[in-house]
Amino acid sequence: ERFDFDPSSLREDEAIGGVDGLARRMADKRFADLGIDREEVQEFLAAAPQAAAAFARLYDKSHPEAERADDPAGEARRAIERWQNHFADLDHAAEDLADELRLSRGDISTALVERMREKHRLTVRILPADVVPGLVHRLDLHARQLQLSEMLGGAARRFQIARQIASLEYRDAIDTLVEGAGLSSAEARQILRDHVTDYVALALLMPYRRFLRACEQTNYDLTILVRRFTVSFDQLAQRLTTLQRVGERGLPFFCAHFDRAGFMLQFTAGASGAVYPLEGIRRPQWVPYATFERRGALLTQFVTFGEGEAAPRKWFNLARTIEDDGVAFYSRRAIVLGLEARFSDQLTQSQGIALGPLDTAGP
């Protein structure tokens, strides 16, 4: 069965994210001297939707601000790519702590909460959304509380607790790694620090050997893995990009987050060899666009990308939408998990899908 999606049915304003999508592009500081306001953006889109779409396409394919050498986010991302998103010492440390806490048994949430209380004298408190408006978590050292919004689901709550434990117990190791990266700005260092702290939290929730063994035993069945480790699809996808331990390597996935306009919000290459910003693939028939028409469904697709490469590679992609707990701005995103097509026969979700033709939606 193939999903029913006609890209020609999209209006141009929908394909570029409407006024919001166009306004975001116009807000680039390269255009700051022009003083373009929202009303002008609306007029441009209404009067010349095809021209607006052409501008958006050129903007997205140009060297974005995130790729500038002096851009903190781009600098931090390139540092992560040098490690192939695998931080061996911290991964081992998180695995040892997971074993110590016996996170494979019983209620994981209880074990994490007890660690906070016994080692750090911190309690975890769930607060009404109106008490922490716009926030999903807050550390109140005066009250000795990690305060979490009621808007967070179970997986998100466990992640926030694990992240706080990572920050408290591995701060020195994380700081040493960040300082050793030789980044040029405090902002870039903070971005890398946040990423590595998230990494440790995920490694605590999905300890390396146990997680890799489950991946191999289930043929990387994403549905089973989400249930077995009680994590979200987003958390699972990020962890799958990290499996590069020497002698115990997993499959080389990349992970990308997109908004409805197809604008890339986040990209993690892992060891996949995929190159940001996935040149040659931004077009409506690619699977991230279709996920918004089939909310929550896991869609699959074989594609080719690698514009400018001598031999563009074939990839297998899995994608679905996610809802971000308690965060309005990114309330709906598409996550794409991908790896080279030559590895796809090792995935449960690829079974029964023909390798060709490419650039068409799969079952």
Q: Model segments located where?
A:
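Short juxta-domain linker segments that transition from a proline/glycine-rich
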Residues: R2-P363
